[in-house]
A protein has these predicted regions:
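Single, function-defining residue in the core of a domain
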Residues: 1-9, 13-27, 35-172
Length: 172
């Protein structure tokens, strides 16, 4: 029987870089100008889902470091998960609106650390304003691909999702 915390599995999702020989040069694993150097750096990026109560790995996604996408790996892990209700716990790099919706629609929960609200690439930046201190708050927005004057005038109601941002839940 799987150990649960208040009815949930606790699954930590994180990634690690696995260096390989720089003699291996391909478009998926090799970076040039890594660490301010012109030397090639070849590696894989290992994304894992680890059960904190069972102390076992639940899933892995292996990506070439040059094309790694932690958010894509997180979505793959959530899509493949078929166990009891879970709380997915992850660090920065795994956050996105798409991931939040995906986890919620599968009746799971998430605890994902996000970039600072002042960061240009923070997923939360457009949901503010926020206090300049620690805070917990519920944020509710209607997601849309439209950019009407009504939508632009009410950022407290609507969140525009650009077409170049992955979002699996719009029809069309």
């Amino acid at each position: 029987k799987i150990k649960l915390h208040k009815g949930y599995r606790l699954l930590a999702v994180d990634g690690s870089v696995l260096p390989i020989s720089s003699a291996i040069k391909d478009t998926k694993t090799t970076f040039y100008k890594a660490n301010n150097s012109n030397k090639p750096f070849s590696a894989y990026h290992l994304n894992t889902s680890y059960d904190l109560l069972e102390c076992t790995y639940d899933d892995i996604v292996l990506q070439g470091n040059a094309v790694m996408n932690e958010n894509g790996a997180f979505n793959e892990i959530v899509d493949r998960y078929d166990g009891p209700k879970a709380i997915f716990i992850a660090d920065r790099g795994y956050e996105s609106i798409n991931s939040f919706v995906k986890v919620g629609m599968k009746n799971h929960k998430y605890l994902i650390r996000v970039k600072d609200i002042h960061s240009r690439t923070s997923v939360l930046r457009s949901f503010g304003p926020f206090p300049n201190a620690e805070f917990d708050m519920h944020v509710r927005r209607t997601l849309t691909i439209k950019q009407t004057n009504e939508i632009k005038a009410h950022p407290e109601i609507y969140k525009f999702v650009p077409k170049n941002q992955r979002f699996d839940f719009f029809d069309g």
